[in-house]
Structures are given as structure tokens and as C-alpha cells.
Amino acid sequence: MKIYNYGKFPKDCTYKYGNIASLEDSEIEILKNMGISNIYYWYASGNFEGSGKMLCKKDNLWHIHDMSHCSCYDCIENINLSPYGGYSSLKELKLKCTDELFKEIEPLFNKAKKDKHK
């Protein structure tokens, strides 16, 4: 499993709250057990909430997960990686993103692309 934490807010991110953080080992284990092979993310945790984005690959499909949450649940609790919501390539994913969303995942996208994912 490839895991990459960008470790900072994306340059053009409009919502910057909390402190940059990492996924917990238990959260990584849950994602691994879901069959995810690649995880690229940035995440920030505040007092009672968190924000972030995850670009991940499962069963040869790319997914975007919004890691934002309140104190009622954590950053991966509501993850939905349905095959109907995935993209067969990074190119297809980029074409489907709004400009605003792409700004928040651009460093993750660029790293995945650099790692020779398609």
C-alpha cells in the first residue's frame, strides 16, 4: 500500500482551519482492509472538526474522498468507494473535477501522476 501525506494545506485551498495532521494507524488499517492500494492525502484537525482531501485507488478505480468532519465522526468514517463513483484514470478524474475541487487535490494528483499512475 502506497501512502503519501502532503503534510500542508494546498496553495489555493480556501478553507484553512486546524493543524496539519496524519491519519492514525488504526485508520490506515481500516483503509487497507477496504482494499485500497494507494492513498494520497492532506488532513488538518481542529478542536472539534477536521478538513482534508484524499485521492485513493481501489480496484483500479480512482476516488476522491472529502475528509472534512465534525466531532460526530472521524475523517474516514463516511468513506464511500463505490465502483459507480470511481474513475478509470487520473485523466478522467481531472476532467470530472470542478476547478475549485481540483485546487484542493492538485498536489495529490501531481504526486500520483509522478508516481506513474494513470
Label for each model-derived stretch:
Residues 1, 18, 34-37, 74:
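Residue-level marker of intrinsically disordered, low-complexity segments enriched
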Residues 1-18, 80-118:
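Low-complexity intrinsically disordered segments
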Residues 1-4, 23, 32:
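Secondary-structure boundary elements
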Residues 9, 20, 48, 52-54, ...:
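Compositionally biased, intrinsically disordered low-complexity regions
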Residues 25-69:
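Amphipathic, interaction-prone secondary-structure segments
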Residues 58-92:
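Intrinsically disordered, low-complexity regulatory segments enriched in Ser/Thr/Pro
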